Structure formats: structure tokens, C-alpha cells
Amino acid sequence: MNKVKVYLFATLRDYTGKKMIEMEIPAGMTIAGLKTQMVKDYPKLAPVQESIMAAINREYASDEQILPLDAEIAFFPPVSGG
């Protein structure tokens, strides 16, 4: 098992009630797998699961990217501006 820190921003904090979550994950888990696990633990995230954006160690990451050991993950809603 691998430990990761998941930092949550904006509305994702509202859905979970947390700023940061430490999780144990299996080796080889992807961002998509982590999102699925987060929805199991925090069902209020389900409606926004597909739109959650991610970063690994402060760099944007795709859903297919495998999580490295002891990674810091950031999840945030899509950002738009005007």
C-alpha cells in the first residue's frame, strides 16, 4: 500500500468537509481510480467526479496517470474566468 495526501479546493472542500485527506492506495492506482475511491468515501462528490481536475506534486495530471509513491495530489473543480 502507498500513502498519498489529497488536497481539496473550492467546492470539493464543501462536498467533503475537508481540506486534506490522507489515503492508503494500492500500487499502480491511477487518478481515475483515486477519484472512484474518493466517491466511495465521500458520495457527495459523485455528481462532479468526471469534471474534477487533478495535479500530482503540483503538475497537472490526466486520469490515466499512475500515482507515484508518497505523492501530493490536488483535486479541484474546473477553473474558468472572464
Predicted ranges, named:
Residues M1-G81:
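Ubiquitin-like/PB1-type beta-grasp interaction modules and other compact soluble beta-rich domains
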